[in-house]
Amino acid sequence: LAGEMETGTLGCDMMLVAEPAYSLELKEGGWLHSYDTPVKENLRFPYDEEGYWYPVRVCNMVLAYNPELKTPEELPKTFKEFAEDTSLKGRISMGNPLTSGTTMAAVASLSDKYGYEYFTALGNNDVMIESGSTALAKLQTGECDVIMILEESVLKERKENGSKIACIYPDDGVILIPSTVMTVAEDRSANMNIEACEAITDYLLSEEGQKFMVEGYMHSVLKGFSEVPFDSVDTDGLIEKDMGVDWVRCYTMRDEIRTKFQEAVTIPEKK
């Protein structure tokens, strides 16, 4: 995408990205088409008031553990304890905020709530930075006691592989992360399929479209949508305990947040 941007034209008609911060950047850069979808009044998550982006599915950052090896009483009940409990030193894992949009959103939220000292605590506790699949494998073997991970990864593992890995919904709040859909502006698009893109946006935000999101282990963005992902909990209940993400801060202070994280936490070099 970055390479295409240098040419001034994008080959894609639409984009679906992990979180709204990147949508703010694309909007500011003039890359997006504004569309006033009639579905917007049914949304229970924020959207761009000028119609440049809409949430279409919701990821949920949680903690996870292996109940065959640990009991909930032995493990942190909050994201704060996850970072600060020294009995877990070297036995915790999370994703890489430099490469993962959802992990970036999570560390932005946690540093907003607890300050950059949160990163220092993670570093002091020797948090391992790795992919979700690697972290889940380490939970299975007992190399990790608890991990920070997207709920959908745990639910998928439970349904498709019969895993016993379970979620902890932290008492200091879950971190809900809406993935956003956008249409490329006509003067920035190689194809100019605006009408089709608007129709797809409406479909993604319809009840039928939202059922596919839930089947993919993510939560619906629609008000009154009662279906939840396999083995998950009520979406409105999660909204009530959402820690929240300041998306403007996540965008405008992205470099600072990443730098502070790198200064505190060891990130393995790519092989």
Task: Briefly describe each language-model feature range.
Residues 239-271:
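Conserved C-terminal helix/tail region of periplasmic/extracytoplasmic solute-binding proteins
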Residues 99, 146, 152-156, 172-176, ...:
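Short, catalytically relevant binding-site loops at active-site mouths
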Residues 157-163, 167-176, 181:
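N-terminal secretory/targeting leader peptides
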Residues 2, 10-144, 176:
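Extracytoplasmic ligand-binding site segments that recognize negatively charged/polar headgroups
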Residues 184-245:
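Mature extracytoplasmic/periplasmic domains
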Residues 62-69, 108, 178-193, 212-213:
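A bilobed periplasmic-binding-protein/Venus flytrap-type ligand-binding module shared by bacterial periplasmic
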Residues 21-25, 145-164:
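A ligand-binding cleft/hinge motif common to bilobed small-molecule-binding domains
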